[in-house]
Amino acid sequence: MICRTCLRRASGFARPAAAAATRPMVAASSRAAFSTTFSVCTPPAATPAAAAPATSTAEAGLAPVPGAATTEQAKAAISSCPAGTKLNGLNYFKNKADPVALPDEEYPEWLWRCLEVQKKTDDAADADAGDEFSKSKKQRRLAMKRARAQEAKILASGDLEALAPKIPLQKQSVNLPGAVNGGVQDAVLADEKREELRKAMRKERKAKIKESNYLKAM
C-alpha cells in the first residue's frame, strides 16, 4: 500500500513535466500569430510573369518615356542653338532684353533656305569675277583659273574653233543690225545688239577710270 507522502511526491514530479509539455505549444501558437500578422504587412513577391515585361524592356534598351518625347528626340535639330538659348548681342531695341532661341518648328520654312540663296548668289558672283588685266593678284588668278576651266571644257567638247582669240565687242568693226523698212523683230534685235555694245563700252570706260585714278594716287 502506497502512503500519502509518496503520492504527493509523485504528483509533484508530474506537474513540471506537464507544464514543460504545454509551454512549446503556447510558444508555437504565439509564433504562428506573429508570423501571420507580419505576413499581412509584407508585400507579395513579384511573379515571373509581372517581371518579364520589365526585363524585356531593359534588355531592349528602351526607356519608359512618352511617345511625344521620343519623336521629338528623333527629329534632327536644324538650328545650332537649342531652344531657350539666350542670343547675346542680337537685340536692337532700346531697353529690351536679348532674344531667346525658339524651337525649330516655330520658325518659318523659308528661313532655313536663306543661306542656300546666298550661296547661289556667291557662286554666280565668283563665276563673273576675275580680270586678267586687273591690278589685284587675286582677280588675275581667278581669271586664269576660269580661262583654264573654259579651255578644258572646249577641248572635251571637240570644238577647236572656240579656242580662237575673241575680239571684244567694243573693238569689232562690224555693222549693227537695222533696216529702214524692217519689221518689229528686226527693231527688237537691233535694240538688243546696241544694248550689248553699250554695256561693253561702259565696262571698258569704268576700267579705264579705275586705272587712271590709281595712277594719279601713286
Swiss-Prot record:
Keyword Hydrolase attached: no
Major site of localization recorded for this protein: mitochondrion
InterPro entries the UniProt entry points to: Ribosomal_mL54
A GO CC annotation given for this chain: mitochondrial large ribosomal subunit
Cellular localization per UniProt: Mitochondrion
Pfam families registered for this protein in UniProt: Ribosomal_L37
GO molecular function: structural constituent of ribosome
Assigned keywords, A-Z: Mitochondrion, Ribonucleoprotein, Ribosomal protein, Transit peptide
Function summary: Component of the mitochondrial ribosome (mitoribosome), a dedicated translation machinery responsible for the synthesis of mitochondrial genome-encoded proteins, including at least some of the essential transmembrane subunits of the mitochondrial respiratory chain. The mitoribosomes are attached to the mitochondrial inner membrane and translation products are cotranslationally integrated into the membrane.
Subunit and interaction comment: Component of the mitochondrial large ribosomal subunit (mt-LSU). Mature N.crassa 74S mitochondrial ribosomes consist of a small (37S) and a large (54S) subunit. The 37S small subunit contains a 16S ribosomal RNA (16S mt-rRNA) and 32 different proteins. The 54S large subunit contains a 23S rRNA (23S mt-rRNA) and 42 different proteins.
Family affiliation: Belongs to the mitochondrion-specific ribosomal protein mL54 family.
Protein's name according to its UniProt entry: Large ribosomal subunit protein mL54
Source organism (scientific name): Neurospora crassa (strain ATCC 24698 / 74-OR23-1A / CBS 708.71 / DSM 1257 / FGSC 987)
Gene it is expressed from: mrpl37
